Amino acid sequence: MKIDQAAVAGTLESGDVMIRIAPLDTQDIDLQINSSVEKQFGDAIRATILDVLARYNVRGVQLNVDDKGALDCILRARLEALLARASGIPALPWEDRQ
């Protein structure tokens, strides 16, 4: 999936997450996480984000994640909404997930 534009999904409310994405000129993934529960769940948050990006074959992006204690299912939903917005498609290609 190609990320064409910057986008935002989520809120800064307790129990939610705000994620910002922007395309990069390289194939790297620049991931910055700021979380109120990073000490306890930082590795799990990072793993979830990288899993979703890998499922949709996303590379060459900068992600800024401001987590306020979001559950894994919320994090995944926000990421999928973000990818749809940033790629300019109306819905994710569910059948193409790896």
Curated annotation (Swiss-Prot):
One cellular component (GO) term of this entry: cytoplasm
Keywords: Cytoplasm, Phosphoprotein
InterPro entries assigned to the protein according to its UniProt record, in alphabetical order: CitD, Mal_deCO2ase/Cit_lyase_ACP
Residue numbers carrying O-(phosphoribosyl dephospho-coenzyme A)serine: 14
Subcellular location: Cytoplasm
Pfam family for this entry, one: ACP
Principal localisation: cytoplasm
Subunit structure comment from the entry: Oligomer with a subunit composition of (alpha,beta,gamma)6.
Function: Covalent carrier of the coenzyme of citrate lyase.
Protein family according to the UniProt entry: Belongs to the CitD family.
The protein's name: Citrate lyase acyl carrier protein
Originating species: Citrobacter koseri (strain ATCC BAA-895 / CDC 4225-83 / SGSC4696)
This protein's encoding gene: citD
